[in-house]
A protein has these predicted regions:
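Buried hydrophobic positions in well-ordered alpha/beta secondary-structure cores of metabolic enzymes
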Residues: 12-15, 68, 129, 171, ...
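Glycine-rich phosphate/diphosphate-binding loop of Rossmann-like nucleotide-binding domains
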Residues: 7-24, 28-30, 148-220
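Glycine-rich phosphate/nucleotide-binding loop
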Residues: 48-49, 226-331
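Short acidic loop-to-helix transition motifs that present clustered carboxylates
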Residues: 111, 217-224
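Flexible, glycine/charged-enriched surface loops at secondary-structure junctions
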Residues: 34-40, 178-186, 209-217, 309-317, ...
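Buried hydrophobic packing segments
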Residues: 22, 26, 202, 296-304, ...
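N-terminal glycine-rich phosphate/adenylate-binding segment common to multiple enzyme folds
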Residues: 50-154, 241
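N-terminal beta-loop-helix "entrance" segment that forms/cooperates
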Residues: 34-57, 226
């Protein structure tokens, strides 16, 4: 029987509550489709930082390197500054393992009430492809004259031809498997060096995909179109910052960030990829057992697809859709009163059923 070795980082807050439900559902998928998991837990979190001064050990990257994938819950706590937790754990993993694509699907499910009027399940279905290793999230910069009236803060944006081309190529290849339409997020009217460079490369790459329709919008009007015309989109590609913003807006448009998954991908599979829900650690509800586990479970389905078991991935995604459409189990964020474990169990049972 095929065994997948998975590193598990539950992290902080509700991450510790939703990760077990993801594992429960994936284990059921393995039982049904003839594979199994060897889960290895890493207790790295903001609590670790408070105790040790580090989000993960100095050799943390080396510890993760042998695994087939990384299954992450959520990272963040009010006791630790957000930039410390992000740059101490997630960004090093993404960069050392060349996870240069952050893929976030957006889909309106039956049984989920969208804040937008007159949209039906199936009418909103697109993906955001975010550049995940460079761009605006650079650590080049610094601060001078701190604490004085002359204080200066500088942070440099870094776009490389190689980095932009590879994420654009991924977006176009993905579009070929979907509705053959790629939209680029830009702001080249105001950001006059990096964004025109992005636009030029977008058009260059697009010439190699004559079967794929293309368009581009400035980020400000693009956010408006996400709300007014979400059916316009198939694959939306953006820089690190723009992709981050759009991939949070997308799930909000379809009803709940709690159901949204993401994959940090090394498409060449030279290094492990990492799968995590879009939502944060939600310390305001942590410990109450009411967090929505669907984002974690759907991220698990994305992991299954990446690991080469698409039938199992399809079964998990169907179980999510059927549970949302027909089951009574639903957490408070989507209009119910079920616990995290009850919703996870309902999805796992549907995966088990053939």
């Amino acid at each position: 029987m095929k065994t997948f070795n998975i590193a598990v980082i539950a992290g902080d807050g509700i991450g510790k509550e939703v990760v077990p439900e993801g594992i429960r559902v994936l284990a059921k998928a393995g039982e049904r489709f003839g594979f199994q998991f060897d889960w290895h837990a890493f207790d790295w979190s903001c609590e670790t930082y408070v105790k040790t001064g580090k989000m993960m050990p100095d050799d943390g990257i080396q510890q993760l390197r042998p695994f087939d994938a990384i299954f992450l819950g959520a990272v963040g706590h009010p006791s630790v500054a957000d930039h410390v937790s992000l740059w101490g754990l997630l960004i090093p993993i993404r960069r050392h393992f060349r996870q240069y694509v952050n893929l976030r699907p957006v889909r309106l499910f039956e049984g989920i009430e969208t804040p937008l009027k007159n949209w039906k399940p199936g009418e909103i279905d697109f993906c955001v492809v975010r550049e995940n290793n460079e761009g605006e999230y650079s650590n080049i910069g610094g601060r001078l004259y701190e604490g004085t009236e002359d204080e200066i803060a500088v942070q440099q944006t870094v776009f490389t031809r190689r980095g932009v081309n590879r994420v654009l190529k991924f977006a176009f290849d993905l579009a070929r498997t979907r509705k053959k339409h790629v939209t680029s997020a830009t702001k080249s009217n105001g950001i006059i060096h990096t964004m025109p460079f992005w636009d030029e490369l977008f058009h260059e790459i697009g010439k190699n995909y004559s079967d794929v329709r293309t368009d581009q919008y400035h980020i400000d009007i693009l956010t408006a179109h996400f709300v007014r015309h979400p059916d316009w989109f198939d694959v939306v590609v953006g820089s690190n910052l723009f992709g981050d913003i759009l991939s949070d807006l997308g799930p909000a448009v379809v009803g709940s960030i709690g159901i949204a998954p993401s994959a940090n991908l090394n498409p060449e599979r030279e290094f492990p990829s990492m799968f995590e829900p879009v939502h944060g650690s939600a310390p305001d509800i942590a410990g109450r057992g009411i967090a929505n586990p669907i984002g974690q479970i759907w991220s698990g389905a994305m992991m299954l697809r990446h690991l080469g078991v698409p039938d199992a991935a399809d079964a998990v995604e169907r179980a999510i859709a059927e549970t949302l459409a027909h089951a009574k189990a639903r957490t408070p964020d989507i209009g119910g009163s079920s616990t995290t474990a009850e919703l996870g169990a309902a999805i796992a049972e549907r995966v088990r059923q053939k």
